[in-house]
A protein has these predicted regions:
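A transmembrane-helix-recognition feature enriched in membrane-embedded lipid enzymes
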Residues: 116-135
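Structural recognition of alpha->loop->beta junctions
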Residues: 32-46
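Short, surface-exposed patches at the edges or C-terminal ends of soluble domains, predominantly
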Residues: 110-113
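Short internal beta-strands
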Residues: 13-19
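Glycine-centered short loops/turns at secondary-structure junctions
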Residues: 10-12, 41, 61
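HKD (HxKxxxxD) catalytic microenvironment of the phospholipase D
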Residues: 44-103
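Short, small-residue-enriched loops and turns at beta-alpha junctions
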Residues: 22-25
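Short, small-residue-biased leader/transition segments that mark boundaries at the very start
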Residues: 2-9
Length: 135
């Protein structure tokens, strides 16, 4: 899980993850972690417009990072991936606008949406969560 996830309660944190993936059981593991963050106060959007593979973060309309690095143990330790750190309000606001457009093609993860998932999907997500150090 993300370090400092309790900050979601105090600060506005919005996360978009793909509703589908190119890797089996990845959405279930992602949903499991997203559900935990949702319970802490983060808004989680499930992107329905296809497979969304971007790794972008915008902070306070002044700073953003864009790149290929996944925030998981394997990528941070072993993979040769990188992100650009951009300190430019104009670029950050353009990315914010793109995010807001993508929100229109997304489903907000709510307790009701979570409850509609089958027990099997929840179990697969739990197992996937246990395996995240190896993914």
């Amino acid at each position: 899980s993300l370090v400092g996830s309790e900050m979601c309660i105090r600060d506005r944190v919005e996360i978009m993850i793909p509703a589908v993936s190119d890797i089996a059981f990845t959405p279930d593991a992602s949903f499991y972690i997203a559900h935990k963050l949702m319970k802490k106060g983060a808004k989680i959007y499930l992107f329905n417009g296809g497979f969304h593979h971007s790794k972008i973060m915008m902070v306070d309309s002044t700073f953003c990072t864009v790149g290929t690095a996944n925030l998981n143990s394997r990528s941070l330790r072993y993979d040769y991936e990188t992100n650009a750190f951009i300190f430019d309000p104009k670029t950050t606001n353009e990315l914010n606008a793109m995010f807001e457009r993508d929100v229109q093609n997304s489903t907000l993860l709510t307790p009701e949406v979570w409850k509609k998932r089958s027990g099997w999907k929840k179990f697969v997500g739990w197992v996937g969560n246990l395996m995240t150090p190896f993914l």
